A protein has these predicted regions:
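Short glycine/serine/threonine-biased micro-segments
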Residues: 108, 115, 124, 145, ...
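Glycine-rich anion/phosphate-binding loop at the beta-strand->alpha-helix junction
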Residues: 231-361
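Exposed alpha-helical structural elements
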Residues: 68, 72, 100, 182, ...
Length: 361
């Protein structure tokens, strides 16, 4: 298939299997209808007749849209070293792009396969579970499995959920400080809180407002809403409920202006003291008691050495680094690998891995 256009010179197309085919302007065979459509779309993209963002709407076949983007990228990157890296070696076949287009990924032109390792088994609250870990970091799965074995040998782990509230904090502006304080007092009053709770209940079958604290900065307010979201992470439902709540508030405060539905006091996907102190999402505590036999035979250490290491590394070392919630060894490694394997928002590992490891001899 020729990937050159009337506006661009020929180039070598490098295929995922490593072979190269010389693309020329001379037609050695009559292109298929699919190839003709792809070539015309690439030409239209290069000429500005077709907008990149409209490709999915114009091309009804999701896989054809992927081929067009890959061909377009090859044309645009002629002579650049990035060509082979970003297109030719990127897998794209054997994937159902209809599941992601206009849903969770724009401008798709391939996918990244990540190996998934199985860690465990692990005994948690009397139940045996396995941990799927998607990673390219050697020894991570083996390390986690070793930890699981140590916990199992000592009777398993017990857990407790201590808090359960997703948060979102919009930034709202009022014309003066006095109006901002008035809005704060109303939101935190029993009347205001009940009105907000009712709006949340009407907006979602699962999202329930359980608390709100309002921070005033000049004539701006940052109400930090806390809501239970059932088994879902819940960012969409809480954001939708807050949008409706603000509309309700504007009936009372007609000078209230939305600056942003997320004012960064949430705090979403960023290391923040407010998450460390007040929590965000589900707060979980896990506990296990390692036997001396396990520490000696499996971990090759003893309680005194292990507790001392935890103090000097995870507590003192982290404090010297100015860590915010990073008083652990590698929580983010495990959380990120599990999120990748289970299709969660990987960027949420920031607040999800904020934790402290404590040990007592």
């Amino acid at each position: 298939m020729t990937l050159s256009t009337e506006n661009h010179t020929p180039f070598n197309q490098v295929h995922p299997n490593g072979s190269q085919q010389e693309a020329t302007t001379e037609n050695t065979s009559i292109p298929t209808q699919q190839e003709a459509r792809i070539l015309k779309s690439v030409s239209d993209l290069c000429a500005g007749k077709l907008k990149f963002k409209d490709l999915d709407k114009e091309i009804k076949n999701p896989f054809d849209a992927v081929l067009i983007r890959r061909a377009f990228l090859l044309v645009q990157c002629q002579g650049m070293n990035v060509r082979d890296t970003f297109s030719s070696d990127l897998p794209f076949e054997n994937y159902d792009y209809s599941d992601v287009m206009e849903t969770c990924c724009e401008n798709a032109f391939g996918y990244i396969p990540v190996p998934v390792g199985l860690a465990g088994q692990l005994n948690v609250d009397g139940t045996t579970v396995y941990l799927p870990l998607a990673t390219t970091e050697g020894a991570l799965v083996a390390s986690v499995s070793r930890g699981c074995k140590a916990i199992n040998m000592s009777g398993g782990a017990t857990t407790a959920i201590t808090s359960d509230a997703m948060t979102r904090a919009p930034c709202l502006r009022l014309p003066s400080l006095s109006r901002a304080v008035e809005a704060k007092r109303w939101i935190e009053s029993s009347e205001g809180f009940k009105a907000l709770q009712d709006t949340f209940r009407q907006s979602s079958n699962h999202c329930r407002l359980i608390g709100v604290s309002v921070h005033v900065v000049g004539n701006h307010i940052y109400p930090r809403f806390q809501a239970s979201t059932g088994d879902a992470m819940g960012m969409n439902m809480i954001t939708h409920s807050i949008r409706n709540s603000i509309s309700m508030m504007q009936n009372r405060f007609n000078d209230l202006e939305i600056i942003s539905l997320s004012g960064n006091l949430c705090a979403d996907k960023k290391p923040a003291a407010v998450n460390w102190v007040e929590g965000r999402g589900k707060g979980v505590i896990a506990q296990c008691r390692l036997s001396s036999v396990t520490m000696s035979n499996l971990l090759k250490t003893d309680a005194k050495q292990l507790a001392g290491l935890n103090t000097m590394k995870n507590h003192v070392g982290s404090a010297m680094a100015g860590a915010s919630g990073g008083f652990n060894a590698q929580a983010s490694n495990i959380v990120t690998a599990m999120y990748l394997a289970t299709g969660q928002d990987v960027a949420q590992n920031v607040e999800s891995s904020q934790c402290i490891t404590t040990m007592e001899e």
